[in-house]
Amino acid sequence: GSDASEFLNRVYTNAWSKLAIGKCRYGLMLNEDGMVYDDGVTTRLGENHYIMTTTTGGAANVLGKLEDYLQTEWPELDVYLTSVTDHFATASLCGPNSKKILNKIIPDLDLSDDNFPHMSFKEVLIDKIKCRIMRISFTGELSYEINAPASYGEAIWQKCIEAGKEFNITPYGTETMHLLRAEKGFIIVGQDTDGTMTPIDLQMDWIVSKKKYDFIGKRSLYRSDTMKEDRKQLVGLLTEDPNIVLEEGAQIVSELNQKPVEMLGHVTSSYFSPNLNKSIALAVVKDGKNMMGRKLFVPMENKNISVTVANTVFYDEKNERLNA
């Protein structure tokens, strides 16, 4: 609809009115209390046409929430929402050879950074099948997401597998995806958030517009309690023994002999990283941004694990692989 850009400006924390056609943007939604509700990448397909992605399994809830606002709060806006979740199948080509594989599949598509930069999309034909390709990444690697009509999903998948054989292509699952995104410090809403986290708590204040007049949850971000310096904040954790993988949900303490023991936070995501050859974890810790380098403890079933508070980005901090 003609007010689609204005609608996105109101539901996301960042700005959308100047997003160019053919470009993608990561967006963060808040509840009215200022806490993170959902995130995803939205692409501008045309002047008045966008396609929005949400967290895994969150599409129906987000659609319901947006419809509620559209019908009860902003009925004057010329906007129409349609669920296309079941209409498309998506194959994600991910890794340093993904550009070479895509070039084999669509040899006449210019994949140069000038023509097809990160966070942009193209409409193409693959074996006469109309597809959308987004150059976006949740793994931190060079990635292309191919969206095809659902009935052609398997055909596109097989096309990717066949084209990638010479590069030793292999399917990867959600566990691998979760590990790779954790190495980059990318959050999963509902895992690294719990309904009490603001963008600032997640070290994502960069995504909150300072210029927009309003958006859902903006006023609540400036409440005294929400602006406290010692709120629980997202941090990285590194174990003293790099082979120990922390339990997700485990509590974090500063003193082992304190009675009663004060719980500073908990582990939200934890994995062993083959890329780094050590365990990594994300956690929310009270006053976390001022705890960098501090030694803390994570009590587990058989022993107390010593950890050090670290940056949330463990790998490729300069995004060299993402922009390869």
Predicted regions and their residues:
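Well-ordered mid-protein domain cores that form the structural environment of catalytic cofactors
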Residues: R10, N14-Y69
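Internal amphipathic helical hairpin motif
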Residues: S2-V36, S98-I129
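Conserved, structured C-terminal
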Residues: L45-A324
